[in-house]
């Protein structure tokens, strides 16, 4: 009886010690408050939400996602308040019910940690694994002339690789006309832009496996970087037939948040390029995905179609990954939108030279936020 009492006492003491260790400690990196802002670009009306976290020591960190609801913000701030920014991995797990907002919070917490350490985020994460980041220009959907014009603008802005939309099939299993139209599009673009131009063909998960197979065969000799989201991830057997019988690399992943679906693709050897959505997964989660991908010789090219804060996070993520491939970046058509993005977060952030984005050596994410452009506060 006495021994049992002693064991229970020791167990109770151990539990109390663990609880004390887990309790948030006050300090300059303790999160004091959080605010969010809805941002809209002036011409395109592209929308995204920017999160601002501030510590008790006055350090401000920034993150971004697509949208932030007031109720979700209140819930997130309740989780974050009083916690240390260095607990970003733990807090990422505790915000699992708020996937979009936790991605933004993860960026902001790492921004704070980097500023406190007086080091870029990629150094905090063990980088840099590279000193510049290959850039992919996102080309909006349109007819052949519109796509060519957008690619020419992007090339003039420094891009040498492009994510182009596939010509949509007229119907399911469209056959030869669909294949011919896509082959012509890629051939025309390469002829107009130069042999040093590379292309990712974005199918937006809109094709049947049969159409995707026909397209993959037709584009093989044109050497696209990869075929992006050729079909929905509903039948691993169908994707396996597509991946196993063709040479054109396949990219999947923008719809995946949990690791289970990604592990299925890896286990069956169905993927060449992993495309996690940065605005939904955040830096920490994608680094976990990337470690799994590296062990299976799969490259990582995060999906990003948001604002410049997300671009900054993407660059630091890229410079922390050994198996990073390329980073897509939105390219606004309107000069006013380009100026807006440059003024919002820093003029040099999205500047591309000979196909590459530069890494900032500034602490944290290296942002220079103009608060006057943040738009309406979420409340």
Regions found by a protein language model. Give the residues of each.
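N-terminal export leaders
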Residues: 1-22
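Metal- or metallocofactor-binding catalytic centers and their adjacent structured scaffolds
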Residues: 54-119
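Conserved, mostly hydrophobic/aromatic
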Residues: 58, 105, 118, 162, ...
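Metal-dependent enolase-superfamily TIM-barrel catalytic cores that perform enediolate-based chemistry
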Residues: 131-246
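Shared catalytic-loop signature of beta/alpha-barrel
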Residues: 71-74, 82, 89, 234-356
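Flexible C-terminal active-site loop/helix
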Residues: 6, 15-16, 27-39, 43, ...
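Glycine-rich, aromatic-flanked loop segments that form ligand/cofactor-binding clefts
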Residues: 105-142, 146
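Glycine- and other small-residue-rich loops at beta-strand/loop junctions that grip anionic moieties
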Residues: 65, 102, 178, 201-208, ...
């Amino acid at each position: 009886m006495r021994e049992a009492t002693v064991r229970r006492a020791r167990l109770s003491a151990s539990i109390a010690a663990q609880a004390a260790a887990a309790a948030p400690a006050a300090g300059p990196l303790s999160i004091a408050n959080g605010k969010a802002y809805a941002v809209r670009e002036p011409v395109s009306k592209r929308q995204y939400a920017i999160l601002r976290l501030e510590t008790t020591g006055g350090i401000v960190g920034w993150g971004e996602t697509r949208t932030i609801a007031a109720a979700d913000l209140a819930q997130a701030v309740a989780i974050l308040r009083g916690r240390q920014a260095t607990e970003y991995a733990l807090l990422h797990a505790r915000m699992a019910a708020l996937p979009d907002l936790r991605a933004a919070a993860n960026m902001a917490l790492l921004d704070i940690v980097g500023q406190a350490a007086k080091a870029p985020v990629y150094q905090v994460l063990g980088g840099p694994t590279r000193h510049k980041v290959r850039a992919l220009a996102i080309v909006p959907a349109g007819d052949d002339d519109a796509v060519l014009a957008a690619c020419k603008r992007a090339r003039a802005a420094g891009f040498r690789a492009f994510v182009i939309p596939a010509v949509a099939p007229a119907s399911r299993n469209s056959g030869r006309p669909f294949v011919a139209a896509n082959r012509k599009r890629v051939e025309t673009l390469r002829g107009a832009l130069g042999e040093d131009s590379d292309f990712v063909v974005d199918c937006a998960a809109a094709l049947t496996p049969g159409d995707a197979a026909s397209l993959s065969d037709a584009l093989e000799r044109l050497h696209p970087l990869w075929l992006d989201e050729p079909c929905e991830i509903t039948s691993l057997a169908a994707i396996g037939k597509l991946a196993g019988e063709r040479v054109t690399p396949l990219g999947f992943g923008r719809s995946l948040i949990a690791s289970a679906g990604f592990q299925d693709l890896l286990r069956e050897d169905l993927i060449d390029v992993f495309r996690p959505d940065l605005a939904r997964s955040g830096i920490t989660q994608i680094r976990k995905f990337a470690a799994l991908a590296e062990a299976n010789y799969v490259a990582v090219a995060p999906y990003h179609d948001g604002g410049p804060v997300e671009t900054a996070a993407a660059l630091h993520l890229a410079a922390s990954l050994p198996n990073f491939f390329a980073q897509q970046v939105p390219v606004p058509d309107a000069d006013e939108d380009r100026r807006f993005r440059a003024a919002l977060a820093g003029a040099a952030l999205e500047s591309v030279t000979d196909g590459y984005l530069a890494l900032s050596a500034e602490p944290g994410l290296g942002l220079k936020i103009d608060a006057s452009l943040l738009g309406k506060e979420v409340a």
